[in-house]
């Protein structure tokens, strides 16, 4: 380009320069920004509608159930999703108390988050290679129903959002009902009714304190821990859960 041409170019207003260059790039950035903005709006509205839907409609399946099904197929096993929905009022009171005693003793008082537990988890994460959670029952329900399996800070962010929505739009009764019906309780087994039938050959409506605590004890790791063959560690954990159940007394939902 000649020096004369460069002088003419410099004299042009900024908006008139490189219509296929700078302005085109600016248009691309605006287009990308609009797409991101649209996706955020869709996620925001869609997530609210989905949480509202599941306030009245029972979740038919979860990402974890699907993943576990494929894992079984890859291992040469049959596809298995054993789940039997049970309404809140039909689940035995000991089972509800065992869940609270084992997983979230402030469940009826907190608003989806237990900040003291989160603070402890953050301190542990500073010295751990794995992400350690301080999850409430509401957070676990958000994770189990709406999110994919795994642990990452991104997923924790989504979990926090869905936890907030559940706390806003669901009652504690509905949260506990969904939690006890979708939680993994064994290899291909989900929910306390299917687990009760598999391990105790009885309905979850008839579980006593000991059986409910035996079931709640495996909630953190249902594929590694056994209800029927508990280790010494699990037996001690079951004792602690039963002690907490007595301390909690009847729960007022």
Language-model regions: role of each:
Residues 3, 8, 24-253:
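Juxtamembrane regions of bacterial inner-membrane/periplasmic proteins
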